[in-house]
Design a protein with these regions (language model features):
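Catalytic machinery of carbohydrate-active enzymes
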Residues: 1-350
Length: 350
């Protein structure tokens, strides 16, 4: 138990966007418990925009700076560090910097050498969601560590940057609308499809995205296809098939603007990627496509938010463990299931 309130706390999570999003509730809980404590969040430069969208984080700390410079948290020497993602080099660096309280887990041998507060926590064998596991680590700070998924989904409060007017105009575009003015509706549901995952997870077949696009009524839906510039070539078969029905926004926006675009849209469909978790955290309709196999199942990685849903087969076959690209569990998720959910959501707008 803490003897005094810390001046500041560093949350260390230096992996991908989705992992970072699922760690942001830790900042919210720390701020609720210690309102006067400055919260620093350490990550990689490419996740900076999503970290800075969190109102409970006072400052972003680049892990490269942390490893090579004497960093501060809002001008103060670091007081506490939470190793949410265990990284040996970061743990040893935190000890070398003399951070007074260094919190890690008992199942990392190097944490016994580098941390002075240890939490009994094994992610590998846990039945908990990743966000619930993240909230277990601050236990030595004397705060509540058990949260339901519904409670966690209410903790985000993300504040996106203003959306560039040029991108905002896309959400009102009449492109791909019926030629007959009598059929045009200005209140179409703005849907983002994010087919790829930069190789970070199982993906729904591109053919299923194509089928879904053909199933949706353009009188009711305005469809955008997103992805990184590097993923554009891999998406070409989709654009060849249904490019006349969608707006291609791949590689058009930096992360800050993409977050703002998701916030301004109505819904997003993706596998367990960063954009899916961003959409859920923003309170948008977030439709996640998952395989039922551990450790990538929705029990661990489902998007959290008031309007998040997951689509997953009940039974796992495990045939794709050696060939994730040929995942029959993902292929078994029917486009018609997504169509039904999207039409139900759109009926609340149109």
């Amino acid at each position: 138990m803490l003897k005094q309130v810390p001046d500041n706390i560093i949350i260390s999570r230096t992996d991908s966007i989705g992992d970072v999003v699922l760690t942001l509730p830790v900042a919210a809980v720390l701020k609720q418990h210690f309102p006067g404590t400055k919260i620093g969040f350490m990550g990689r430069s490419y996740t900076r925009a999503v970290i800075e969208a969190c109102p409970y984080v006072d400052t972003f700390i680049d892990v490269t700076d942390f490893m090579h410079e004497a960093v501060t948290v809002c001008g103060e020497k670091p007081a506490v560090i939470l190793h949410e993602l265990p990284v040996p080099a970061i743990a040893y660096r935190a000890k070398k910097l003399g951070i007074p309280q260094r919190i890690g887990t008992t199942n990392r041998s190097y944490h016994w050498l580098t941390c002075n507060r240890l939490v009994r926590l094994s992610r590998k064998n846990s039945q908990l969601h990743e966000a619930q596991l993240n909230l277990r680590l601050p236990e030595p700070l004397g705060i509540r560590t058990e949260w339901s998924l519904a409670e966690i989904g209410q903790l985000y409060g993300l504040k996106p940057a203003p959306l560039d007017p040029a991108f905002a105009a896309l959400l009102q575009s009449e492109e791909h609308h019926p030629a007959n003015p009598a059929l045009r509706r200005p209140d179409r549901y703005n849907l983002i499809l994010h087919p790829k995952s930069q190789g970070h997870g199982r993906e729904w077949p591109l053919e299923h995205f194509i089928h879904l696009i053909r199933l949706l009524d353009l009188q009711r839906f305005r469809i955008f296809v997103s992805g990184t510039a590097k993923e554009r070539d891999r998406l070409q078969p989709l654009f060849d098939a249904v490019g006349s029905l969608v707006t291609d926004i791949t590689g058009m926006m930096d992360l800050a603007q993409f977050i703002a675009f998701i916030h301004a849209a109505d819904g997003l469909v993706a596998s367990g990627t960063g954009p899916l978790h961003i959409a859920a955290a923003l309170g948008k309709d977030a439709y996640g496509l998952f395989p039922p196999i551990r450790p990538v199942h929705p029990g661990r990685w489902a998007p959290l938010g008031p309007r998040a849903q997951v689509f997953v087969l009940k039974d796992a076959c495990n045939d794709c463990r050696k060939d994730p690209a040929g995942c029959s569990c993902m292929a078994g998720i029917e486009p018609l299931w997504l169509k039904a959910a999207l039409e139900k959501a759109a009926s609340g707008i149109i």
